[in-house]
Each structure stands twice: as C-alpha cells, then as structure tokens.
A protein has these predicted regions:
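Switch/communication elements of ASCE P-loop NTPase nucleotide-binding domains
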Residues: 1-69, 73, 308-454, 460
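Short polybasic amphipathic segments
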Residues: 11, 88-90, 119-132, 312-320, ...
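Short, surface-exposed beta-strand/loop "edge" segments at domain boundaries and coil↔beta transitions
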Residues: 19-20, 96-104, 128-142, 305, ...
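Short beta-strand micro-motifs enriched in acidic
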Residues: 27, 107-121, 300-305
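Conserved P-loop NTP-binding catalytic core
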Residues: 42, 56-115
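Short secondary-structure junctions
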Residues: 69, 100-102, 286-296
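Long, charged, glycine-rich C-terminal linkers/tails
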Residues: 73, 292-312
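Electropositive, glycine-dotted interaction segments
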Residues: 112-290
Length: 463
C-alpha cells in the first residue's frame, strides 16, 4: 500500500437531521498545491439547533462509512422528516508519495424504504476523481465507480466497463452480488466493505485500489470526531474519555481510554502503561495551557483481575504546588482539555490529520481558547473543525475560517459578506444578528416582552 496524505476540501450535507442542504469549503483561499503547507481551521457559529453539530456528526458518519462499519443504529431517525433519503458528499485532495495527486469526491446516499428489513441502507454511492497536475485540476471530475439501486433494489453499476473489469467471470459476479447483499443487511458501504475490496484487489483497477485504500486508512487513523457524548460523560462525572492516537511500543493506539472519575479503578497493565505514556507526552503542552498544572496517576497497588491477568489500581490526580487532588474535583474545562489534548497535538504535527470537536469552548477560558487557535493557525499542520458559542475566536481567525449557520434549512452554511480586513468579525456578526444585511437570516428573532411574559406566567402556574 502506498503512503498518502489527505486533506478534506469540502463537505456537502443533504437531508441529514435539520439540514435540508448545506455546503462549505475547508480551505477557500489556499491553492491545492499548497494545501499541505499550513493548517486548516474552520469554526461554526450560530443559534441553537441550526446545524452546527450536524457538521461534526456528518464527518463522524463518513468516518464509519469509510471504515466499513455499520450506519448508526438510529440512522433512520436522523434522515430529515421531509425526505426519505440523506446524502453526504465529501471532497478530498489525495497526494501519494510517488508524486501523484487526485481530487476525489465521495458521495453516499442513505435511504429509508419499506423493502429494507433494517429500516435504511445505502441506496447509492459514487466515487469521482480528477488528476492534479502542477497544482491544478486536469479536466473535469470523472466517475470512477458508482452504483444506484433501482426500484427492485437491484444495483445499476457505472461505468459498466470498470465493473466488468472488477467482476470478470461468473464466480466473481456471484461474489459481487453476495457482497452487495451483505452490505445491505449490515448497513455498510459497498465501496468500503471487505468483501467488495477483496474483489477490487484481485482486479487490474490500480488507481481505484489505491484511492479506496487511502481513504479507508485516513478514516481509520487520521480522522477523529469528538461529539457531545464526550462532554456529557465528563459533565456527569462518569468517565473522562481520553481520546488518543499514540504510537506505543511499536503499535499505534487509537480510540478512547476511559478514565474513572468516581475513585480508583483497576485496569490491566498494558492499558495503564499506555495511559501513563499518553499523559507524559501531553505534560508539557498541558503545563503551557494551564500554568502550574500537571496530571499524573496515583497508584494504589496491583491486583489480580478476573481474567487472571495482573492489573493496576489507580486514579488520576491533578498536581498544583505539590498538592494533589482527584481529577473529578478539577474544573470541567480542564477535564475537557485533557480529553482532547492528545488529538490536538496529533493534528498540530500531522498535515494529514483532521479532528472535529463539538463545543470546543465548553468550560474553556475564552482567552486560552483564542490563544490555542492562534497558535494552531500560525504554525500547525493539520485540520481542525469545531463548533462554539464563545465569540472570542471571531477576533482571532480570518473571515474565511468562520462559517455561520442560518435559519434557512435549504442554505444552512454561509460566510459573512462585505467584511473588510480592518473589520472586527465579532462586531459584524452581532450587527448581522440584530439588523440583518446578509444573504440569509442568521437567527430567529427573540422578543424580550414574550420572554418576560412567559417567565412571569410560568411562575404564576408554579405558585
């Protein structure tokens, strides 16, 4: 498998949750040839329920699709009520180590139909590609491979010549039919399913093999999403999901390490060693973000676990001026930073790494948030996508790095227009909220007298 670097260039969402249609570019003013030369930061702002979180969830959904994992168990309920299908389209720049570069557009349509015993499944997928030469696209994007189910749930593959090349012979046609049926039953993508990829690898479609492998590897190792579930676990004092991508003992650890908040926990020695190493790797950055603070494990001893292996009983403590305090007594902001810091470090140092964080500002001091984003913008390498309500980043980031949600479900994401370099984006946003002047309304107007009356009447009802 060739080594590759990947950057997300754009994302389009249709009929997912409360977004009928919304699209945006990740790097508006950056030439494709220079896409890997600097970080890409994009923040989403808007009123509650306007589609900010849907962006993070759409990226998380694509990650599951490209990893060959099943769709969400409640996927049918996430399709907009006014439609029977949802589509996400995501465009990449893929650069291989042999010098070849491509623009690749993946589009997946998920439909709910009465004929699906599983409630919903993929109705269509398409992979389009265009070669990049000297930083420019050479010609239009062409259909690399696609299929669409007809009314009888039978797939129509295009281009037919490529499909015939992949499934030469009756035996492979049967294997392809089985792969399609399995992907429908398991609610997985056909393009990224192990069964279909086994057929693909046995074909002569080298270009398609390399592109599918690159996207699958990117989804597995370099694309991460942090949703409100993480923040909820922290807020409930349940666990701190320590999200990591970390090289440890000749292997790469990927996922969430659960850190107990209710007192000491016992984990096997391998998990403890990994946790200790991750904390040590973050120590300098954490101390720079929160001066005087360090986090370390306090070991209470070792004991035999149920499976017969040796475990370590420990809990995390925060240390300030040689005084130790259980991590559950630290502020929610510190615990939130601890949870995502390893991924932020990975994103800062890896130009093919993307992390999307919902409510990045939750519990975080606004000056610290602004300083962190400024450093990432100036000297980072990867991609950061975040949602926020704190307006401090509007004074730090350029206008092209901020996307605002609208009240129009048919056009959810826009950039503010008529913004000059000397304008304060924060002031312009507040002005647009109050008096308009943009292509779409940014928020539904709230009336003070109605709020006042509702509060008063509710108080009367409650005695």
């Amino acid at each position: 498998m060739k080594n590759s670097k990947i950057r997300i260039l754009s994302l389009s969402i249709e009929h997912l949750k409360n977004v009928q249609h919304g699209s945006f570019d990740f790097q508006q003013d950056v030439l494709p040839a220079k896409a890997f030369d600097q970080s890409s930061v994009i923040g989403f702002y808007g009123q509650n329920g306007s589609g900010k979180t849907t962006v993070i969830q759409a990226l998380g959904l694509f990650k599951q699709i490209a990893m060959g994992q099943p769709l969400w168990t409640d996927m049918e309920k996430c399709i907009n009520l006014d439609s029977n299908k949802a589509t996400i389209s995501i465009k990449f720049l893929i650069k291989f180590d042999d010098g070849k570069s491509y623009h690749v557009l993946y589009s997946g349509t998920i439909a709910k139909r009465a004929t699906y015993k599983v409630g919903c499944a993929f109705a269509a997928e398409k992979l389009s590609v265009a070669s990049e030469v000297a930083g420019k696209i050479s010609g239009r994007m062409t259909n690399l491979f696609s299929y669409e189910l007809n009314f009888d749930d039978k797939p129509n593959f295009t281009p037919k010549a490529r499909y015939d090349s992949i499934v030469k012979g009756q035996e492979k046609k049967i294997q392809a039919s089985v792969a399609m049926r399995i992907s429908q039953e398991k609610k997985t993508s056909l393009l990224f399913s192990p069964d279909f990829f086994a057929l693909l690898k046995d074909s002569e479609e080298t270009e398609m093999i390399e592109i599918v492998q690159a996207i699958n590897s990117y989804a597995n190792f370099n694309l991460f999403t942090i949703t409100g579930v993480h923040s909820g676990l922290i807020s409930m004092d349940a666990v701190i999901p320590l999200s990591v991508k970390y090289r440890h003992k000749d292997a790469t650890a990927i996922g969430d390490i659960p850190i107990g908040q209710q007192g000491p926990i016992t984990v096997n020695e391998q998990i403890f060693d990994l946790t200790e190493s991750v904390l040590a790797s973050m120590a300098d950055v954490l101390g720079a973000l929160v001066p005087g603070l360090s986090i370390e494990p306090m070991i209470y001893g070792r004991e035999l676990m149920n499976d017969g292996s040796m475990g370590v009983r420990y809990e995390l403590v925060s240390v300030r001026q040689d005084k130790r305090l259980p991590i559950r007594y630290e502020s929610e902001g510190v615990r939130k930073i601890l949870s995502v810091l390893n991924l932020i470090i990975a994103m800062y140092n890896n130009d093919s790494f993307c992390v999307a964080i919902d409510e990045l500002d939750a519990g975080v001091f606004e000056v610290l948030l602004g300083d962190l984003l400024k450093v990432i913008m100036e000297s980072g390498k990867g991609q950061l996508v975040f949602t926020s309500h704190n307006l401090r980043p509007l004074e730090i980031l350029d206008k092209q790095n901020i996307v605002f949600t609208t009240t129009n479900p048919e056009n959810r994401y826009i950039h503010l227009k008529n913004i000059r370099p000397t304008n304060n984006l924060r002031d312009c946003y507040i002005r647009a909220l109050n008096i308009g002047g943009q292509d779409e309304p940014l928020a539904t107007e709230t009336k003070f007298h109605l709020i006042r009356r509702a509060l008063r009447n509710s108080g009367v009802k409650d005695g």
